[in-house]
């Protein structure tokens, strides 16, 4: 305040410390992405959003957008903003009364701005009329209606922008929109019809239409009921009747990027969470695939310098540190180093290098959109301090279009590594002993596991890769070539929302498959232990000594027999462990044959012949082993396994528990 008059701009118009805002932008990207996401989730859950014009976050926008589903979040306006809003509104009225020529106040709009009028109120009314050009389908949530969650996001962002006091609108109108939000009254906006260049003109005009009581305006109430303007005002508790727009107020309501940036905020909240989830899923993938944790070594990533990669590797390293699966895998590698390749395939080994840049892109886009939702982006801007209206182009939504295109490309890349990992997981040629399609049932002919899921994943990923194509290179000149370049911000945000939905489908399918793999590793471990014990018992009974207690040369076979069990994949024989065409019985027999061939002269003696004991050994095993294997399956189904699930001692356990216990996601 100067001499009792509100001043809404600094004397020189620039911040001396950081005039180009690069310092603030760079500072916003310091610190950890993980910490940012945790903060975002915390903000999303807060019950109140306090608006002052400059501190709104994407997570708060996402929280308000989701609040319409029953989790109410209240919006409060800063009383300190009232004076600035009033000052700009008063300036417009005084300017009009003095006969000052101002765009959108005394002139037409866009390509017809050469026209003049002194009837400012009627001009605003006509603005809303001609912008109400959207097309709706049947119903209030049809394929041609903007999702109500996105409308709520747009309302919040527009209030925040107008609170800064550069737009020439009454504070009472902002209070009315706030009441709509707090009482879950949502105007119906068209899904299409904006190019986000002179702002999101067409969809925002329907909010203005509701405020002014246009007959075609509709809203949806808390229970999904359709409301006309009168009912919407009544349920929201907005008193004083419909608003008669003063000069500039219609333009202030529609000439902003709130619909595009609101939806972008919703998208980026989910994109950040999904990016973090992809890092965690990659670590769990390493666990169930018996991967080598060396790929997360900090020196490797420090030498690459990229912060997203370094953090992705650190998160994976943290999850794998001390993992029981990693310890078990290390024993497998030591026991038979030739059983699998020296290095894991790229989908695992280079996952930090792949995911890191995508996270950097998403993080940068988040900061860009947060700047946008705290920006004043209409035209003209009312600078009370210099007693002038500034004609510019802050309504151009290029930050939205560019950030959404980039985010969509990053989302597609995350989807690509997700399906690559999933494809390895369900393929028994690559997955280090897990059954084909993660089936694991008693009868492989009647259990196809995730075969349908793999087909669905291919469909999801194909659509996702198509959506990765940019929107912003499809600009068409509009409005008699006045809007000859335009951002297509909302269109890009809508496509990115589709991409996020598809990545959620992929991540959900993949997560359930990982949980299935964890359970199969548990079954595998118990089954292998039982098979080893059974083979050991039969070997001691049949191969160790004769009827008179004499020791047989065949007693030395047991160690090699158990080594076969250790090395053989359980699910290669689990459905019928004694079937002679399966590798287990073939290799056990080969051990006995090899020992017999090395038995020398004693092999000629029927009492010490190993060949003579092969049939007895196999018959004894066939009598016992299938029953023992079946008992393991029964214990698995009843949750009474003798060896506990390794996942419970791992840092990835909370995610497994969430799916299997909280959601009940059994397969």
UniProtKB/Swiss-Prot annotation:
Q: Where in the sequence is 2,3-didehydroalanine (Ser) found?
A: 198
Q: In which pathway does it act?
A: Phenylpropanoid metabolism; trans-cinnamate biosynthesis; trans-cinnamate from L-phenylalanine: step 1/1
Tell me the organism's taxonomic lineage: Eukaryota, Viridiplantae, Streptophyta, Embryophyta, Tracheophyta
Reaction(s) catalysed by this chain, per the record, are:
L-phenylalanine = (E)-cinnamate + NH4(+)
Q: Which UniProt keywords apply?
A: Cytoplasm, Lyase, Phenylalanine catabolism, Phenylpropanoid metabolism
Q: Which GO terms describe its biological process?
A: cinnamic acid biosynthetic process; L-phenylalanine catabolic process
Q: Which residues bind (E)-cinnamate?
A: 255, 343, 349, 379, 451, 479, 482
Covalent cross-link 5-imidazolinone (Ala-Gly), where? 197-199
Instruction: List the InterPro entries hit by this protein, alphabetically.
Output: Aromatic_Lyase, Fumarase/histidase_N, L-Aspartase-like, Phe/His_NH3-lyase_AS, Phe_NH3-lyase, Phe_NH3-lyase_shielding_dom_sf
The molecule here is called Phenylalanine ammonia-lyase
């Amino acid at each position: 305040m100067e001499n009792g008059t509100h001043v809404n701009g600094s004397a020189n118009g620039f911040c001396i410390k950081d005039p180009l805002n690069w310092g603030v932008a760079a500072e916003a990207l310091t610190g950890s992405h993980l910490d940012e996401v945790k903060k975002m989730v915390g903000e999303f859950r807060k019950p109140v959003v306090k608006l002052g014009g400059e501190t709104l976050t994407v997570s708060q926008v996402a929280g308000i957008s989701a609040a319409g589903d029953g989790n109410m979040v209240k919006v409060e306006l800063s009383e300190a903003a009232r004076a600035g809003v009033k000052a700009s509104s008063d300036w417009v009225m005084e300017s009009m009364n003095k006969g000052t020529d101002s765009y959108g106040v005394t002139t037409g709009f866009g390509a017809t701005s050469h026209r003049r009028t002194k009837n400012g109120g009627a001009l605003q009314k006509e603005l809303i009329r001609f912008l109400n050009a959207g097309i709706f389908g049947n119903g209030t949530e049809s394929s041609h209606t903007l999702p109500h969650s996105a409308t709520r996001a747009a309302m919040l962002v527009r209030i925040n922008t107008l609170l800064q006091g550069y737009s020439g609108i009454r504070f009472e109108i902002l209070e009315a929109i706030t009441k709509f939000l707090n009482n879950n009254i949502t105007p119906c906006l068209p899904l299409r019809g904006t190019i986000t260049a002179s702002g999101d003109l067409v969809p925002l005009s329907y909010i203005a239409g509701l405020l002014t009581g246009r007959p075609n305006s509709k809203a949806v109430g808390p229970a999904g009921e359709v409301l006309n303007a009168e009912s919407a005002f009544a349920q929201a508790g907005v008193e004083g009747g419909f608003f008669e727009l003063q000069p500039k107020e219609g333009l202030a309501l529609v000439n902003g990027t709130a619909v595009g940036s609101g939806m972008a905020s919703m998208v980026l909240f989910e994109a950040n969470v999904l990016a973090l989830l992809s890092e965690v899923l990659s670590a769990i993938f390493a666990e169930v695939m018996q991967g080598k944790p060396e790929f997360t070594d900090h020196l490797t990533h420090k030498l690459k310098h990229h912060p997203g990669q370094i953090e992705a590797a650190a998160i994976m390293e943290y999850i794998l540190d001390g993992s029981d699966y990693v310890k078990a895998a290390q024993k497998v590698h030591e026991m038979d180093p030739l059983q699998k390749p020296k290095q894991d395939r790229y989908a695992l080994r280079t996952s930090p290098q792949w995911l890191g840049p995508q996270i950097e892109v998403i993080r940068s886009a988040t900061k860009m959109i947060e700047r946008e939702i705290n920006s004043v982006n209409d035209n003209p801007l009312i600078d009370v301090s210099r007693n002038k209206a500034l004609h510019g182009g802050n309504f151009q939504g290029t930050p939205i279009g560019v950030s959404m295109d980039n985010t969509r490309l990053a989302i597609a890349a995350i989807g690509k590594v997700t399906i690559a990992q999933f494809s390895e997981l369900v393929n028994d040629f690559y997955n280090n002993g897990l059954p084909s399609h993660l089936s694991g049932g008693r009868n492989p002919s009647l259990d196809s596991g995730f075969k349908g899921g793999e087909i669905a994943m291919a469909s999801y990923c194909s659509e996702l890769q198509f959506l990765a194509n940019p929107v912003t290179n499809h600009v068409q000149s509009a409005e008699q070539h006045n809007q000859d370049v335009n951002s297509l911000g909302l269109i890009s945000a809508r496509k990115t929302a589709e991409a996020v939905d598809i990545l959620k489908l992929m991540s959900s399918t993949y997560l359930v498959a990982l949980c299935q793999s964890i359970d199969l590793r548990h079954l595998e471990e118990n089954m292998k232990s039982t098979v080893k014990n059974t083979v050991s018992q039969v070997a001691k009974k049949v191969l160790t000594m004769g009827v008179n207690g004499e020791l047989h040369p065949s007693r030395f076979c047991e160690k090699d027999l158990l080594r076969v069990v250790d090395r053989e994949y359980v699910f290669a024989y689990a459905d019928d462990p004694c079937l002679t065409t399966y590798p287990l019985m073939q290799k056990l027999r080969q051990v006995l044959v090899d020992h017999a061939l090395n038995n020398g002269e004693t092999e000629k003696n029927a009492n010490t012949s190993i060949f003579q004991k092969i049939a007895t050994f196999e018959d004894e095993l066939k009598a016992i082993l299938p029953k023992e294997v079946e008992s393991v399956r029964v214990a698995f189904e009843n949750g009474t396994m003798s060896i506990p699930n390794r996942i419970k001692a791992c840092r990835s356990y909370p995610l497994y528990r969430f799916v299997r216990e909280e959601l009940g996601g059994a397969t």
